[in-house]
Swiss-Prot record:
Mn(2+) 2 binds at residues 80, 108. Phosphorylated on serines and threonines by host kinases, including human casein kinase II. A motif (Nuclear localization signal 2 (NLS2)) lies at residues 184-247. GO terms for biological process: cap snatching; DNA-templated transcription; symbiont-mediated suppression of host gene expression; symbiont-mediated suppression of host mRNA transcription via inhibition of RNA polymerase II activity; viral RNA genome replication; viral translational frameshifting. The gene is PA. It holds the Pfam family Flu_PA. This is Polymerase acidic protein. Its cofactor is Mn(2+).
Length: 716
């Protein structure tokens, strides 16, 4: 690189650059990228000023030959390239003669025509990013900034580029040539990456048009453009006294910092109203499986074949009837839909060869349940933009719901162990790198604790259903395809098992955008009598479809078998996330790992083995009205997993908001517990932000009641 610099640049520039580096105690032989950067910058500054003069009338002119006419004055004063003392002398004399405000940092040029200092930048990164860094550093609206990049882009304050097109094109061409020359010698990559700040690139959106005008109009007082507001915000030093910072921000803001004491916080106000209802895409604790062990039938693994085989294991079918109607729906249609499924499955069996997929006949009951032809007709915006009172539908506020005990039971069930294993050891993927012994040991211990957990069953069920539904939505867009809800597991003895939970019928699915909705009807087996908690099943129509013989301690008993039917919907983006529910395993494993790391750093050795094998030790799991609940390490793993799984199953904007806002209050309370004497302002506003997310979502309401328990115990 050093040789390249000496060949490529004018000897005067090279000499100036060496002098500048030595002034800062840097060695051009060692810091060759910096050497090249300084030379490039010097050359751009000289090219910026070359050939630009001011004539006797004070007009700016370009003269390319050395005209003997001495009445011309150079348009630009070059400050860059002088030693510091001399440079400041020049700046001071300019300020004294022109009355321009003295800059805090040495600029590169002074423009006698526009009467302003100019900071010239040459960057190997995005011009905006470098522009903002410069603006941040100099924090002066008086100094004009002009940035060039090696790719031919440029950016200048208020898009005022000072020079004519041709002069700027010369500079860009020269920079491009330098880049090509470096690249041909294999020097460019190292040079490009060596620019400070490469790691912290933030993609900046280019804002144009209306949004740009709106942005410029909606700035706080005293800012002339979005750019200088951004620069100000980016340069805001966050540490230090809050009151001082606030007064620095605006004259109008005066925040009184209130001390946060044990008596300060109040519990979150939970909404009143009827109890909340189940809103998951499939049944959780209430699901019932029809299963086959060691499946070896013809077509094993083809969902439809597996489903028919599972259906044949049950002999207690009976004439279905409605035991809990859906308040708003046409219940006979749900009944007819189930009868249609049974009839069409029977038809399949009567065929010579069972097909791989089954499309249902488009009967009136299915059209109704799947909302066929219900969507309002779409009108092209061009045709209606002149309608004077065009507005969005008025939608009702969601009805507020109170917490219900069923969601706590659902969560408790999700933490329990089942008698089957739902994942193989390698389900939490192998690391690509040669992974350390410790990491694989942790993974194996963790997998052993959660492989039989019901939350893991929900993961595999969710992955299966979402994958099948997304596939069908893309492959059979117009068809009402019948999709069996299936999962696979291993029994204690290691035998494979295939389970059928029920069926889904998918509606039309022309999904262009990520958020376009596909409707489906789900029909799921259960032994839960819906009349015990009717509020939980508000969105369902429940049929009684058979009697099941169950083995109990007192012998065989017959229990009615129910079918939970409802209309539901999902979108491409939701199905994509549903397919990736295995990530929940990874998230909870990482949480456990951080607990192990904390232990290990205290003991100064790896505690993985002790952590999992010391069965006598208990760990905090969570807060309940009784106080801090504790349990074995396995219970902690399963609880963390269940939380992660429920965050996925019950994902919603309410949950997003609640998690983000309640976390702030949590941090304040924890600071109080750690005797850090926290202070707050506008605590009421924070409570408002949290409570506006408490509307009707069962999982959010449960988290809020846990939060209240935490507050009670934390502040005792």
């Amino acid at each position: 690189m050093e040789d390249f610099v000496r060949q490529c640049f004018n000897p005067m520039i090279v000499e100036l650059a060496e002098k500048a580096m030595k002034e800062y105690g840097e060695d051009p032989k060692l810091e060759t990228n910096k050497f090249a950067a300084i030379c490039t910058h010097l050359e751009v500054c000289f090219m910026y000023s070359d050939f630009h003069f001011i004539d006797e009338r004070g007009e700016s002119i370009i003269v390319e030959s050395s005209d003997p006419n001495a009445l011309l004055k150079h348009r630009f004063e070059i400050i860059e390239g002088r030693d510091r003392t001399m440079a400041w002398t020049v700046v001071n004399s300019i300020c004294n003669t022109t009355g321009v405000e003295k800059p805090k940092f040495l600029p590169d040029l002074y423009d006698y025509k526009e009467n302003r200092f100019i900071e010239v930048g040459v960057t190997r990164r995005e011009v905006h990013i470098y522009y903002l860094e410069k603006a941040n550093k100099i924090k002066s609206e008086k100094t004009h900034i002009h940035i060039f990049s090696f790719t031919g882009e440029e950016m200048a304050t208020k898009e005022d580029y000072t020079l004519d097109e041709e002069s700027r094109a010369r500079i860009k061409t020269r920079l491009y040539t330098i880049r090509q020359e470096m690249a041909s010698r294999g020097l460019w990559d190292s040079f490009r990456q060596s620019e400070r700040g490469e790691e912290t690139i933030e993609e900046r959106f280019e804002i144009t048009g209306t949004m740009r005008r709106l942005a410029d109009q909606s700035l706080p007082p005293n800012f002339s453009s979005l750019e200088n507001f951004r620069a100000y915000v980016d340069g805001f030093e966050p540490n230090g006294c809050i009151e001082g910072k606030l007064s620095q921000m605006s004259k109008e803001v005066n925040a009184r910092i209130e001390p946060f004491l044990k008596t300060t916080p109040r519990p979150l106000r939970l909404p009143d109203g009827p109890p909340c209802s189940q809103r998951s895409k499939f049944l959780l604790m209430d699901a019932l499986k029809l299963s086959i062990e060691d499946p070896s039938h013809e077509g094993e693994g083809i969902p439809l074949y597996d489903a028919i085989k599972c259906m044949k294991t049950f002999f207690g079918w009976k004439e279905p009837n409605i035991v809990k109607p859906h308040e708003k729906g046409i219940n006979p249609n749900y009944l007819l839909a189930w009868k249609q499924v049974l009839a069409e499955l029977q038809d399949i069996e009567n065929e010579e060869k069972i097909p791989k997929t089954k499309n249902m006949k488009k009967t009136s009951q299915l059209k109704w349940a799947l909302g066929e032809n219900m969507a309002p007709e779409k009108v092209d915006f061009e045709d209606c933009k002149d309608v004077s009172d065009l507005k969005q539908y008025d939608s009702d506020e969601p009805e507020r719901r109170s917490p219900a005990s069923w969601i706590q039971s659902e969560f408790n069930k999700a933490c329990e162990l089942t008698d089957s294993s739902w994942i193989e050891l390698d389900e939490i993927g192998e690391d690509v790198a040669p992974i350390e012994h410790i990491a694989s040991m942790r993974r194996n211990y963790f997998t052993a604790e959660v492989s039989h957990c019901r939350a893991t069953e929900y993961i595999m069920k969710g992955v299966y259903i979402n994958t099948a539904l997304l596939n069908a939505s893309c492959a059979a867009m117009d068809d009402f395809q019948l999709i069996p809800m299936i999962s696979k597991c291993r029994t204690k003895e290691g035998r494979r098992k295939t389970n059928l939970y029920g069926f889904i019928i998918k509606g039309r699915s022309h999904l262009r955008n990520d958020t376009d909705v596909v409707n489906f009807v789900s029909m799921e087996f259960s032994l839960t009598d819906p009349r015990l908690e009717p509020h939980k099943w508000e969105k369902y129509c429940v049929l009684e479809i058979g009697d099941m013989l169950l083995r109990t301690a007192i012998g065989q008993v017959s229990r009615p078998m129910f079918l939970y039917v409802r209309t539901n919907g999902t979108s491409k983006i939701k199905m994509k996330w549903g397919m990736e529910m295995r990530r929940c395993l990874l998230q909870s494993l990482q949480q456990i790992e951080s607990m192990i790391e904390a232990e290990s750093s205290v003991k100064e050795k790896d505690m993985t083995k002790e952590f999992f094998e010391n069965k006598s030790e208990t760990w905090p799991i969570g807060e309940s009205p009784k106080g801090v609940e504790e349990g074995s390490i396995g219970k902690v793993c399963r609880t963390l997993l269940a939380k992660s799984v429920f965050n996925s199953l019950y994902a919603s904007p309410q949950l997003e908001g609640f998690s983000a806002e309640s976390r702030k209050l949590l941090l304040i309370v924890q600071a109080l517990r750690d005797n850090l004497e926290p202070g707050t302002f506008n605590l009421g506003g924070l409570y408002e932000a949290i409570e506006e997310c408490l509307i009707n979502d069962p999982w959010v309401l449960l988290n809020a009641s846990w939060f209240n328990s935490f507050l009670t115990h934390a502040l005792k």
